[in-house]
Each structure stands twice: as C-alpha cells, then as structure tokens.
Amino acid sequence: MKTKAIVTLAIGAAFKKRWERLCADNWREYAQKHGCDLVILDQPIDYSERAARRSPAWQKCLILGDPIVKKYDQVAWFDGDIFFNPLEAPNIFDEVPIEKVGAVNSFEDPSSVENKVALERLWKWLRPSPDVPVAGEYKTPQDVYLKYGPPVTPLPAMLNAGVLVASARHHAEIWREVYDNYDDRGNPSYYENVPLSYELVRRDLVHWLDAKFNHLWAWSKFLHYPFLGGPGSRSLRDKILRRLTKYAGNHYEQRIAVACATAALLNCYCLHFGGYAAEMEWVDLKSAATGRVGNLGVR
C-alpha cells in the first residue's frame, strides 16, 4: 500500500459523471506519475439531518477520519473541479511537512498585486450598477473573517480549501472540530472555507504553497481574458455579429475560449474552476500534454 493519496468527494450522479468524463484520466496520470493512490469517495461520510441541510463541501472536513483515508501517512485533497498541468505539476507532497497543512493563500493567487486587480474587476462585473455593491463583497482576508462573525476574528491570511495537504494523525481532530462547531453563514463564508481557514491559520498550522498549486480560473479570466466575461458584457451589435459568424460555421469564439483556458492550465500546476465548472469543457488536455495550445483555425 502506498503511503500517500489524492482524495476527493464525488457525491451525486451528475457530479460524479462530470468528474469521470473530464478529470479521471488527468488525475490518474498525476497520481501514477508521483506514486500516489487515488481515492474517490462517492458516498456521504455523514448522513445526518444536519449534513443533508448543508453543502456536501463540508464533508471534506471528515475525510481524515474515513477508514480508507486515515490509513495513509499524508493525503492531498483536491476539489473535483480541478485539472493538473500534465507536464509541469510537481509532487505536491514534496512541498509540505507532515505536521503542517499545505494550502494556497487565497489573496496571493496568482500574486498579491494581481489578486487585488482581479477582485476589483470581479466586483465591477458583478455589480448591477457601479454604485451598488454585491452582497458579500470584500477586499481583504480581514473583511471575509469579519463578515463571517464570532467566534471568527480577523486574521491576515486566508487559505483556499480547494487544495489541502494534510495528515490524519496530525489534523483529523481539528478538521472534525470545524465540521461540528461551525455552519454556513452565507456569502462570503464559502461553506467550510472560512472556518477551516480560521482554525488552521490561527493555530499556525499552515504551510503556504506556491499559488500555482491552486490557481483560480476566474482570476485568469478577469486578469487576462476579460472578453470571456459573458453575454451580459456585450453590446447588441457584438451579439448579432457573434450569432451570424456562428451560423456561418465559424466557431471562433469557442476556439478562443479553448485556447485561453488551456493556456491558463499551462501557466500553473493546478487550475481550479470554482464557480465556473461549466467552463472546464474549454480545456484541451491533449494540447496541454504537448505544452502547446492547439491550432485555433480562426478565420
């Protein structure tokens, strides 16, 4: 038996089908390359009424107590909407001391300066009008912790719980405490993310990973590909022209989207589609495996 494993939850037929269709081969290649097992949990760990009332995302806090998972010395949790760079993604276990939890700082993805710009553009795009803020809008990790409220207090850093490296022996009890003692409080609590981050950061248990291990596709979009923002940002003239070219058989818009998403994967180790899972279809993993974006054929 191997001593390390990649773990995720794939609960629900639609979610599991999407993971198997889009991610399975990519994940198996990464696990095989780095000598890890791959553990896919497709049933809830907790069947209680409380568990049924909240997102399955909370159940990642229970994986370290799972009979299969806890046999490993160290495991890496990945949300099921992530692709590995097939050429350059290194062994994530080499980065993290076993007594620490490996994670990416949410506000340093891809860097602190670029993250600030990406957030500003995101809020601007989401606001119904320039002077009306979005519910849950924030600028700093302190803002997010404050919005969650007591017993959480502001801290200078926040992790993204989409990618976590941990050890059952060292961390199962703390993760279980988060599951038992916290609950959803709406945006921007992001389910388990804020309380789990709070408890791990305040105890100085986090080993900060290179942001490339958990790069949000949303940030690539808002930093580099704003033209992929969506139909709401287009003029009527633009919408008509796009429709006409599509009917003419020139699917240039789709080809450009594929090129952008594939390039984003090549620029990081793990590309995370949190909130944009439908756009996982844009990634061309065959091209990514060559290190080049395929021919667009744009006319």
Show which residues each predicted segment covers.
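A conserved donor-nucleotide-binding helix/loop in the catalytic core
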Residues: 49-78, 84-95, 99-105, 159, ...
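Conserved donor-nucleotide/metal-binding helix-loop-beta segment in metal-dependent transferases, i.e.
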Residues: 84-133
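N-terminal anchoring/stem segment of glycosyltransferases
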Residues: 1-72, 168-169, 277, 283, ...
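Short His-Asn-centered micro-motif
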Residues: 8-10, 42, 78-80, 86, ...
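Short, surface-exposed amphipathic charged segments that create phosphate/polyanion-binding patches used
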Residues: 55-58, 116-122, 223-229
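Short catalytic/ligand-binding loop motif for oxyanion handling, primarily in non-cytosolic enzymes
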Residues: 15-16, 47-50, 84-87, 92-94, ...
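Short, flexible, basic/aromatic active-site loop/helix in glycosyltransferases
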Residues: 128-155
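A glycosyltransferase accessory/donor-loop signature
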Residues: 76, 96, 100, 150, ...
